[in-house]
């Protein structure tokens, strides 16, 4: 009879962080022991319920005479690339040792379900069992549930951080006596936030902030480049905003924003790339690719700036020729950057 796997995923490694248990944990008795230890360390952790739910499913399948095993696989507290890589590596070992034909995935219904594609690429998933803990419906229990959720760092980062930024953005425009601009600022921030969440850029941003922190602590030149880049980015946004704020026509407003902010944005990118190059040089890594990207960024800026200029004033003398010349110039600049990379 083909072996079936009852699989619990602990993506943020609560089992390791709170109970000190390394994964994977294989076997009914081992998982019962692990669940008890985790429940003792943190009785409110939902992974405890997921593990006991997996034990219940295991017992039911075993009672029907099926060949089944139960396993808990953990990731890392740094949820994202790091945790998912650890889960993938442990799953490979489990599949190699147990040779399951299919799996039943047990989840607490949170971010653990993001790893389902990783699991399905290694073993066929027969079912996903989501464990939802029943709560008392009184006002008091709801208050304590919300309070506990907000004390959870994972939930706080998702809820409190954007709310705090919204209040901060609005208060800045309120102090400037332009509360009507606050709505635009909030919509802009929410747009950026949703894009970051949609494309999973949180880890990239966290890595960038950590790089800046390390450059400051170690006294690297790159820290000055990072600060300069941030200042230039702010100038870029302010310049574009000031140019576009009083223009009624949407196309003209967008073009004005782009026209007056592009080169500040390009300068910001150049300083950011110089910072990365300085870090790479300090760590004895290759730096030539960063200079190539600088050429490509300048080429990109030239095309965007020239296009915005054409949209703003298409009737100007030689407007189309200037746009064509900018495109040709951008191609030449990009070619120089690529050629430089190949030579170095």
Swiss-Prot record:
In its UniProt entry, what is this protein called? Uncharacterized protein AF_2058
- Protein family according to the UniProt entry: To M.jannaschii MJ1032.
Membrane topology designation:
Multi-pass membrane protein
Residues annotated as transmembrane: 155-175, 181-201, 221-241, 254-274, 291-311, 319-339
Record's keyword annotation contains Glycoprotein: no
Q: Do you know which Pfam families this protein is assigned to?
A: DUF373 (PF04123)
**A single Gene Ontology CC term:** plasma membrane
Q: Does the keyword Transmembrane helix apply?
A: yes
Q: What organism is this sequence from?
A: Archaeoglobus fulgidus (strain ATCC 49558 / DSM 4304 / JCM 9628 / NBRC 100126 / VC-16)
Primary localization: membrane
């Amino acid at each position: 009879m083909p072996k079936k796997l009852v699989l619990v995923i602990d993506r943020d490694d609560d089992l390791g962080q709170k109970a000190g248990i390394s994964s994977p944990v294989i076997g009914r008795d081992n998982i019962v022991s692990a669940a008890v230890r985790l429940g003792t360390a943190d009785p409110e952790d939902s992974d405890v319920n997921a593990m006991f739910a997996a034990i219940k499913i295991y017992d039911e399948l075993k009672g029907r005479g099926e060949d089944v095993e139960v396993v808990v696989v953990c990731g890392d507290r740094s949820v994202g690339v790091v945790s998912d890589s650890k889960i993938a590596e442990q799953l490979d070992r489990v599949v190699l040792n147990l040779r399951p034909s299919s799996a039943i995935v047990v989840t607490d219904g949170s971010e653990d379900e993001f790893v389902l594609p990783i699991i399905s690429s290694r073993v066929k998933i027969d079912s996903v069992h989501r464990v939802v803990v029943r709560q008392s419906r009184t006002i008091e229990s709801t208050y304590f549930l919300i309070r506990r959720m907000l004390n959870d760092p994972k939930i706080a980062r998702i809820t409190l951080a954007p709310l705090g930024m919204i209040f901060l953005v609005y208060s800045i425009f309120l102090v400037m006596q332009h509360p009507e601009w606050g709505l635009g600022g909030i919509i802009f921030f929410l747009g950026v936030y949703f894009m970051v969440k949609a494309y999973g850029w949180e880890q990239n941003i966290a890595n960038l902030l950590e790089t800046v922190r390390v450059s400051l602590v170690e006294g690297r030149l790159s820290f000055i480049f990072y600060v300069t880049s941030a200042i230039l980015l702010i100038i870029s946004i302010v310049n574009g905003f000031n140019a576009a704020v009083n223009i009624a026509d949407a196309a003209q407003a967008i073009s004005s924003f782009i026209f007056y902010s592009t080169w500040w944005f390009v300068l910001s990118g150049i300083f950011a790339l110089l910072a990365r190059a300085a870090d790479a040089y300090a760590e004895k890594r290759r730096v030539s690719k960063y200079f190539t990207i600088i050429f490509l960024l300048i080429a990109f800026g030239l095309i965007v700036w020239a296009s915005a200029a054409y949209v703003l004033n298409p009737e100007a003398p030689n407007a189309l020729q200037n746009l064509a010349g900018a495109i040709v110039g951008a191609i030449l600049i990009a070619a120089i950057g690529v050629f430089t990379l190949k030579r170095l």
